[in-house]
Amino acid sequence: MMSSKSHFVALLLIIFLIVNVQSTRIMDDSSDCVFKGPCQRRSDCYERCGLKPPSRAALCQPMGLQGRVCCCL
């Protein structure tokens, strides 16, 4: 009985830590992105970011209700 209680407490602690880390990430407003306008795919962002393909410093990421936006790193 005691081991099942300790397993339960350990599980709760792990869940608490995971939720806490996730909420910290969500609340972090700092961003390395410079947003440069709408896009449909990554290739749309190369010119906006001033990069040449196949650079990985340009992303086309979802931005809420605004659709997808170029993120220049």
Swiss-Prot record:
It comes from the Eukaryota. It is found in: Secreted. Disulfide bonds join C33-C72, C39-C60, C45-C70, C49-C71. Transmembrane segments: none annotated. Residues 1-23 form the signal peptide. GO terms for biological process: defense response to fungus; killing of cells of another organism. GO terms for cellular component: extracellular region. InterPro entries: DEFL. It holds the Pfam family AtDEF-like. Keywords: Antimicrobial, Disulfide bond, Fungicide, Plant defense, Secreted, Signal. Belongs to the DEFL family. This is Putative defensin-like protein 270. It comes from Arabidopsis thaliana.
